[in-house]
Amino acid sequence: DKNAYGIDLIL
């Protein structure tokens, strides 16, 4: 998944 900045966030 990508956030609004085009960065994939996996926490």
Curated annotation (Swiss-Prot):
Post-translational modification: Glycosylated.
A cellular-component GO term for this protein: extracellular region
Primary location recorded for the protein, binned into one broad class: secreted
Subcellular location, record wording: Secreted
Keyword check for Secreted: yes
Domain Albumin, chain residue ranges per copy: 1-11
Tissue occurrence: Placenta.
Known function: Binds copper, nickel, and fatty acids as well as, and bilirubin less well than, serum albumin.
Protein family membership: Belongs to the ALB/AFP/VDB family.
Subunit record text: Dimeric and trimeric forms have been found in addition to the monomeric form.
Protein name as it appears in the record: Probable alpha-fetoprotein
Organism in which the protein naturally occurs: Bos indicus (Zebu)
